[in-house]
Design a protein with these regions (language model features):
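Conserved phosphate-handling catalytic cores of large alpha/beta enzymes
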Residues: 107-108, 117, 122-131, 136-204, ...
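Hydrophobic helix-and-loop "lid/oligomerization" segment in the mid-to-C-terminal part
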Residues: 2-114, 134, 152, 184-400, ...
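Beta-strand/loop nucleic-acid-binding surfaces
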Residues: 472-487
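Non-catalytic interaction/regulatory segments
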Residues: 431-447
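OB-fold single-stranded nucleic acid-binding module
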Residues: 394-400, 487-516
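Beta-strand elements of well-folded, non-transmembrane domains
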Residues: 421-423, 438, 497-499
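Short aromatic-glycine-enriched beta-strand elements
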Residues: 461-469, 506-510
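Structural detector for short beta-strands of small beta-barrel domains
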Residues: 442-463, 491-497
Length: 516
């Protein structure tokens, strides 16, 4: 074990036994047995019966990366079984989240006998009741929290219904993947990779079965070079969990964020296409949507006069022309820039304001929304992020009260796990051994590294806006938007390690986020 890894596991309080478990190789035998899911055999038999009887089957998904991946997994599963089925990704704007009564009527009118929900359904009580009235069986596969009694349907496959096993939150695509294994009788590695992508994008805790499937998904993409996914990568030559979270997932999510009609289904078409020509046509469309999403988000952020909120405890901003799907991205940018809680809102139907909230540790946004329940139509979320809707008439009082709730609150950012290292620790060989601890993510955060550097090694670039330089012969650094200060003495750089590629050459780099 090298010096870098020793310092990391010491800081993370990881024992030698835990370390060995974390870095050990995984294979397909490491996957969870699908039979751990209650009712999965019932679901499998009903689907086999439907195939035998030539029934029409509809997969009903969701517009985020998890729902799109889950839909793609089951659609490809049926394709491998040589059975044609339908699928539908609802529009965030036209249909809303989850299967609804109107869509059940439409599905029924087209002669479907069986609906399989993926990544939705557990809270869609009225729609499932409607399906039963129309003699449509529903196999409900979902992972969202069960808040009320179980809905009435043919059967439910859900992580929290497992028997004789510790509950671990798993995403909708993971549940769909387990069902695919039961139907196919084997593990398809492309479907596994889609499930691992969704596990990362839906921020599932990276331990136990979630950790195993993500490790397998990364390895599968590295080995099999799936064109559909690699074409969505910013750097396809270096694949890790960040490839999924920062490169592929945002692109998969883009269509659901801003497309207001059924074209959101093109993302499933892309992920399930076998034709290179069709892939390239769809990819061109996807890339145009990604660019549009970035433009909308950036322009919305630029419209905010942050100085006008200097005296506010909570930033509350209403946008006239920003779509609901990007409002959370804007809220996150505001939070990162201002370091104070924010609520970003846009106009929905009939003057109703819909939006997203973001907060720092110290001000629980979910509790604040609960306290203001009488002013809101709906709300939900957790301590640092939430969503809400309210009538515009209630906006002034909402602003006043949420600012009052945040008065005197001491805010702090999430504490970084910082490992003190020397220049000699930062070598490519040491980094490669450290990388065996990956994947990092929810519940297993990637550490930051703190290293001392001479002021003479710091070079300002882009008219003094950014900094770069060398830490050692094998490690460089880059610091975006950190060039304003004067470097009159040696400093400590704090950042994360990454591999950069330029003209076919890979180098170790510290991406600096803080200077001390």
């Amino acid at each position: 074990m090298n010096s870098l890894v020793q310092k990391v596991i010491s800081k993370m309080n990881i024992s030698l036994e835990e370390y060995n478990n974390l870095i050990k190789d995984v294979d397909l035998s490491s996957l969870e047995n699908p039979s751990c899911f209650k009712n999965i055999d019932i679901a499998t038999e009903r689907i086999k019966q439907a195939i035998k009887n030539n029934e029409k089957i509809m997969i009903y998904g969701d517009y985020d990366c998890d729902g799109i991946s889950a839909t793609s997994i089951l659609y490809l599963t049926f394709k491998k079984l040589n059975y044609n089925v339908g699928y539908y990704i609802p529009s965030r704007y036209k249909d809303g989240y989850g299967i609804n009564e109107n869509m059940v009527d439409i599905i029924s009118s087209k002669g479907y006998n069986l609906i399989i929900t993926v990544d939705n359904g557990i809270s869609q009580i009225a729609a499932l009741k409607k399906a039963k009235e129309l003699n449509i069986d529903v196999i409900l596969t979902d992972h969202h929290e069960i808040l009320n009694d179980l809905p009435l349907c043919y059967t439910i496959v859900h992580p929290s219904l497992k028997e004789n096993k510790e509950y671990l939150p798993e995403c909708g695509a993971y549940v769909a993947f387990m069902l695919s294994i039961k139907l196919l009788g084997y593990v398809d590695e492309y479907l596994l990779t889609l499930a691992s992508l969704a596990t990362i994008s839906d921020m599932m805790p990276l331990r136990l079965d979630n950790r195993n499937i993500v490790k397998l998904g990364i390895k599968s993409l590295q080995n099999n070079k799936y064109d559909t996914l690699l074409k969505l990568c910013d750097n396809p030559s270096f694949i890790n969990e960040k490839t999924f979270s920062f490169s592929i997932a945002p692109k998969v999510n883009s269509l659901g964020r801003i497309i207001k009609d059924t074209k959101v289904n093109r993302m499933v078409s892309y992920l399930t296409s076998c034709s290179e020509e069709e892939q390239n046509t769809l990819l061109k469309y996807i890339n145009s949507v990604v660019l549009e999403r970035k433009t909308i988000t950036d322009e919305a952020f630029k419209k905010i006069d942050l100085s006008s909120f200097q005296n506010d405890n909570v930033i509350v901003k209403v946008f006239d022309d920003v779509c609901e799907g990007v409002i959370g991205l804007v809220a996150q940018k505001v939070l990162m820039e201002c370091k104070k809680p924010c609520v970003c809102l846009c106009y929905g139907e009939e003057g109703i304001l819909k939006g997203s909230c973001r907060s720092l540790i110290g001000f629980n946004i979910a509790e604040a929304l609960n306290d203001l329940d009488d002013l809101l139509i709906a709300h939900g979320g957790h301590a640092q992020a939430g969503g809400l809707s309210l009538n515009k008439e209630n906006l002034p009082l909402f602003k006043e009260k949420i600012n009052s709730l945040a008065k005197g609150v001491i805010l702090k950012e999430k504490e970084k796990l910082i490992v003190d290292v020397t220049k000699d620790d930062l070598s490519e060989d040491n980094f490669l051994e450290f990388s065996k601890l990956a994947p990092f993510g929810e519940g297993f955060e990637e550490p930051y590294f703190k290293v001392k550097i001479s002021k003479d090694n710091i070079i300002k670039i882009s008219n003094g806006k950014h900094i770069r330089g060398s830490i050692s012969s094998s490690c460089s650094f880059i610091g975006w938007n950190l060039g304003e200060r004067e470097f009159l003495e040696d400093v400590y750089l704090i950042g994360k390690l990454e591999i950069n590629e330029f003209r076919g050459k890979q180098t170790l780099n510290l991406k600096v986020e803080e200077i001390q």
